[in-house]
Swiss-Prot record:
The keyword Phosphoprotein applies. Residues 220-275 are annotated as: 8 X 7 AA tandem repeats of [PT]-[AT]-A-[ENT]-[PT]-[PTS]-[AG]. Probably involved in the organization of the actin cytoskeleton. Induced membrane extensions in fibroblasts. This is Cdc42 effector protein 1. PROSITE patterns: CRIB.
Amino acid sequence: MPGPQGGRGAATMSLGKLSPVGWVSSSQGKRRLTADMISHPLGDFRHTMHVGRGGDVFGDTSFLSNHGGSSGSTHRSPRSFLAKKLQLVRRVGAPPRRMASPPAPSPAPPAISPIIKNAISLPQLNQAAYDSLVVGKLSFDSSPTSSTDGHSSYGLDSGFCTISRLPRSEKPHDRDRDGSFPSEPGLRRSDSLLSFRLDLDLGPSLLSELLGVMSLPEAPAAETPAPAANPPAPTANPTGPAANPPATTANPPAPAANPSAPAATPTGPAANPPAPAASSTPHGHCPNGVTAGLGPVAEVKSSPVGGGPRGPAGPALGRHWGAGWDGGHHYPEMDARQERVEVLPQARASWESLDEEWRAPQAGSRTPVPSTVQANTFEFADAEEDDEVKV
């Protein structure tokens, strides 16, 4: 049948065309690479000729004739070609052999490599000391500096060196003694915390201020003269008011009747106003005018005119009268009785009446006595004393 036969022929033709492709590829893949498969030189400077490992040379070798070879015929034998190649190799290899001699010295490298300098360039206060420390004290390994060709390949000159660590036994004073590392007064090496000293001025403290305030009262007390050096100003009026209570009560111008009488009466309480200030300066003053002076009790003396006991104005008397008239305050009854027992043991009956007379002028007048009246009072007291001595 033509239909089936045509179909079979078409099938066989398709198989015949396709089958050789696969079979040939498998057989040709096993062949080895040969010199015939190498392409010819491409004409550029890299592919002018080819030289194999076994010495086979092929390609354009016209450049060999330009270097002194015979340029007779273009077809050369392999031997002549190998001879030319060997000559070329000798000519190319000769210059390296001539360069075996020591070449011109290269410029010397820096004294210290920048890498090494940056590695040890810590902040230093003294740059000169730092340079001397690096160059002088640090020991560099210079044993392999000399090589066979006479050029330094390792060490300080080449920029590569080994910095040895300083021993701990070497102290700063040893370096200072050598002179290579000058000493700096501001920097000191401390091996322990006990030798560390930090000087800081934080200003005056509260304790120092308190001590200064406490030392102020002691200084005036030391500068004040002794009580014995004071002039006996109170003794200008020998007739003490506390020592003569009957005379005060018997005198017509009593303090209660005339407030200004004590300043004019020689036997009045204000006859010796500066007595407390003169006698109580080394003892101190109180805010209310009371004198805090303590001293021996005044001796009682008899007066030929007044007929009563009379004694010098001592510290106790000055304290009593200074509190009664100068300060405008009076002693309590207990203090008055105590002084009465010590100074006037025989005038117990008239003491209470004397206290009542003292209290009257205190409520009426508190004005201090003028200085002029005090001066007149002292003069009057001196005149009265002279009159009493004459009688």
